[in-house]
Regions:
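Conserved ABC ATPase "signature" region
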Residues: 100, 115-133
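H-loop/switch region of ABC-family ATPase nucleotide-binding domains
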Residues: 198-199
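Conserved catalytic motifs of ABC-family nucleotide-binding domains
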Residues: 158
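Catalytic Walker B motif of ABC-type/P-loop ATPase nucleotide-binding domains
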Residues: 162-165
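The feature captures the beta-strand-to-loop junction immediately N-terminal to the Walker
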Residues: 36-38
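Helix-to-loop junction immediately C-terminal to a conserved catalytic motif
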Residues: 51
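Conserved ABC transporter NBD signature motif
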Residues: 59-73
Length: 206
């Protein structure tokens, strides 16, 4: 298998000021990895470089052997943002409708949902432990339930790599424990490569 994430002498600068300096590391298939650091330490920049949202000033960042900034095989990559988008919380969408978005092809918002993938939606909600919440309004969910909904959405494509940005921020202790149990299962049983971005080393080490 190709290495999911590789940084090779990667530098990145904002306004000529280096933020990421000569970074070299690889995340191998099936690995559970974490990018840790306090706010302002550059971990979000590293994540954006890994996902091709930023291009390194020099050096290379590779996703499955391809330059991250020109990577196109996005069904292999799942991304879980830190919080539910405000629009998803305001509009009367159900959990199932939000998870359905994971089946859209590419990142085209006009792409047609493929009905044949509806079974994947059910499987993803079950893996995230929210199958009993399918018809609930997003606005009625707790923070922890919303986070599991976003994870389910990212799992519909059956990704090889799952990147999570501060996944337990604002989640209570019970929700955090459920999250860690679920993520360990995804990594151990399905072999998904997991990358957690967090400022809290305790949350990662649990």
């Amino acid at each position: 298998d190709l290495i999911p994430v590789r940084f090779e002498e990667a530098w990145f600068s904002y306004n000529s000021e280096p933020v990421v300096r000569d970074i070299n590391f690889s995340i191998t298939p099936g690995e559970f990895a974490a990018i840790l650091g306090p706010n302002g330490s550059g971990k979000t920049t590293l994540m954006k470089l890994a996902l091709g949202l930023l291009k390194p000033t020099s050096g290379r960042v590779l996703l499955f052997g391809e330059p991250a900034e020109s990577f196109t095989d996005w069904h292999r990559v799942g991304y879980v943002p830190q919080r539910t988008q405000a629009t998803e919380s305001r509009f009367p969408a159900s959990v199932r409708e939000v998870v359905n978005f994971g089946s859209y092809s590419g990142f085209n918002p006009l792409a047609i949902f493929k009905r044949k993938d509806s079974s994947r939606v059910d499987e993803a909600m079950e893996m995230a432990g929210i199958q009993n919440l399918a018809n609930r309004r997003v606005s009625d969910l707790s923070v922890g339930q919303q986070q599991r909904m976003l994870i389910a959405r990212s799992l519909v494509r059956q990704p090889d790599l799952l990147v999570m940005d501060e996944p337990v921020a604002g989640v209570d202790a019970a929700g955090e424990e459920q999250f860690h149990t679920m993520v360990r299962r995804l990594n151990r049983d399905l072999g998904i490569t997991i990358v957690l971005v967090s400022h809290d080393i305790g949350a990662v080490m649990r």
